[in-house]
């Protein structure tokens, strides 16, 4: 058995970006120009604030790329109890699904922290 990526490719390169900061407005068009895809890990609770992308632009800006949950407020998961974890990631997923119109399947822990 041999594992292959789309179009029969044997190797893959991934691009992964966190937090939906304003510079994504410049980054995403570069990916689009060269036909490249990326995963963007968004915090639904920080959207619309200061240095972050606006909720109203999420669906169009990230169209064709993967959106993944990253926690509503980017809290360190090692500092949360089970109930708080479910809320932090479950509510983020629900809100991102409303914004994108499709099922969000990916998840990236804030700070890369886990226990």
What name fits each language-model region?
Residues 14-17, 68:
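Generic enzyme active-site microenvironment
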Residues 32-115:
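Metal-dependent polysaccharide deacetylase catalytic core of the NodB/CE4 family, i.e.
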Residues 27-31:
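Short, well-ordered alpha-helical segments enriched in acidic and aromatic residues
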Residues 20-26:
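Short acidic, Gly/Ser-rich segments with clustered Asp/Glu that frequently serve as metal-coordination loops
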Residues 17-19, 109:
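Short acidic donor-binding/metal-coordinating loop in glycosyltransferase active sites
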Residues 1-15, 22, 52-53:
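N-terminal pre-catalytic segment of deacetylase/amide-hydrolase enzymes
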């Amino acid at each position: 058995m041999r594992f292959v990526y789309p179009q029969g490719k044997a190797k893959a390169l991934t691009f992964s970006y966190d937090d939906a900061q304003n510079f994504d407005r410049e980054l995403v068009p570069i990916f689009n120009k060269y036909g490249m895809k990326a995963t963007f890990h968004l915090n639904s609770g920080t959207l619309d604030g200061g240095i972050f992308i606006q909720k109203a632009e999420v669906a169009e800006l990230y169209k064709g790329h993967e959106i993944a949950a990253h926690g509503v407020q980017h809290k360190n998961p090692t500092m949360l109890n089970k109930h708080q974890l479910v809320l932090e990631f479950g509510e983020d997923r629900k809100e991102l699904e409303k914004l994108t119109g499709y099922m969000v399947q990916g998840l990236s822990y804030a700070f890369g922290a886990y226990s």
